[in-house]
Amino acid sequence: MTANQTKKSVPSFTSDIRQGVSNEGCLVLYSGGQDSATCLAWALEHFDRVETIGFDYGQRHKVELECRENLKQKLIQNFPDWAAHLGEDHMLDLAVLHQVSDCALTRETEIAFGEDGIPNSFVPGRNLLFFTFAATIAYRRGLRHIVGGMCETDYSGYPDCRDDTIKALQVAINLGLERRLVLHTPLMWLDKASTWQMAEEVGGKELVEIIRQESHSCYLGEREILHDWGYGCGHCPACELRAAGWESYQKSRS
């Protein structure tokens, strides 16, 4: 098997994780979006103790934060074995990001791409801060593993979603805390179709349906229109990416 095939193979990756850390605890960066919801389910399947952390950073729409709680409750109701492993939720106020960031996720600005190819939905430093605060909570809670839904395959040009960024951040965090925390990004080499597939492998069609209906990706906060792939405006980059992934996922199953 080539290195590229290994990166894109969900079964081989999940098997490797299952061997080493299932008896430990982790902290999941959980926003209520498709990626973080998939990572939460993945963590509940692979770790004995799972806590979550979310951030209110002055987003244009609070819909994702509302979906965050609804989706978690659906997981608790439909997956009682997971519910036994789900612990405390930590919600942090990072309103300072709204003060220092002028982007389409924190301002009423039309989504567009800059000359460098990075969309103006990029919040500079967001994931750097998220992981740093998560590491602080993990340190205090005695959790060695932190799970995030960053993805380089579908990362829309966000530099803080790159594998190199996360690896460098892990080194910096461990030096600064004098710990050996592990930053897990199980979606890093998966496209959106493979992310849907991963959800099915972790929790079956029931989990896929929960993520489809309860998670939120739309940059415009649209929750009135239910498409085959979930709620959203259908036109923003996040909706287009999610829709294309769903279509590819469905084709792979036929």
Swiss-Prot record:
The keyword Metal-binding applies. Its cofactor is Zn(2+). Transmembrane segments: none annotated. Binds 1 zinc ion per subunit. Zn(2+) binds at C218, C233, C236, C239. Its EC number is 6.3.4.20. ATP binds at Y30, S31, G32, G33, Q34, D35, S36, A37, T38, C39, L40. SUPFAM superfamilies: Adenine nucleotide alpha hydrolases-like. Pfam families: QueC (PF06508). NCBIfam families: 7-cyano-7-deazaguanine synthase QueC. HAMAP family: QueC (MF_01633). Catalyzes the ATP-dependent conversion of 7-carboxy-7-deazaguanine (CDG) to 7-cyano-7-deazaguanine (preQ(0)). Belongs to the QueC family. This is 7-cyano-7-deazaguanine synthase.
